[in-house]
Design a protein with these regions (language model features):
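Glycosyltransferase catalytic domains, chiefly GT-A lineage
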Residues: 1-194
Length: 194
């Protein structure tokens, strides 16, 4: 039914779109925690299940790797000039989240019809750089509660982001340091896995 809108990219398969359907598949549950398979759990994530989402439909962590790369205009972004946040409706790069860990408030997602919303956004944009993540960021950009970075510590951050102070806020730099010292989840983003 959806094959004509799902496309693969680089090392991303069509499985990346499965998270769009979580509110529909798990409609009998109040809350679902979605985690990518390339995550290492260092702490008990049960505390995430009961966190107050402050009325938001989802919770996630900011994608510091994307934020840093975008601000620096790194080689990755130069190769992918078509990835223009303004053009695809991302209002604030500072609020762009990583979709590797998402806490879904199922009732709120159903209320805003998030499944249809995500599918309609995907139909509109057929060449997104990070298709699933970009769609989720467009769909939920005003409806996300941001978790501390320790819950999605991207393992490449301290290696790739050598000039953090030039491109990231002091608050984000402090969160990166805290997350590195005491991670709840380590996320092995990128093609390189342990």
């Amino acid at each position: 039914q959806y094959d004509n809108i799902f496309y693969e990219k680089s090392y991303f398969s069509t499985a990346m779109y499965y998270r769009f359907f979580i509110p529909k598949i798990f409609c009998d549950f109040e809350r679902v925690i979605y985690c990518d398979s390339d995550m290492l759990f260092k702490k008990d994530i049960s505390e995430l299940f009961f966190i107050d989402l402050k009325g938001k439909a989802i919770a996630a962590c900011r994608d510091v790797a994307v934020l840093y790369s975008y601000r620096k205009r790194s080689e990755i972004w130069q190769r992918n000039i078509g990835h223009n946040f303004d053009k695809i409706g991302i209002l604030s790069i500072d609020n762009y989240f990583n979709s590797g860990l998402i806490i879904f408030d199922i009732n709120k997602c159903v209320k805003i019809q998030s499944v249809s919303l995500c599918l309609n956004i995907l139909k509109k944009y057929d060449n997104l750089y990070l298709p699933d993540q970009d769609v989720l960021n467009i769909a939920f950009q005003n409806n996300v509660y941001f978790l501390h970075l320790r819950w999605n510590f991207q393992w490449t951050i301290h290696i790739e982001c050598k000039q953090k102070s030039l491109y990231l806020s002091q608050q984000i730099i402090e969160e990166i340091y805290e997350a590195r010292m005491d991670p709840g989840i380590i996320h092995y983003i990128s093609e390189t896995k342990p």
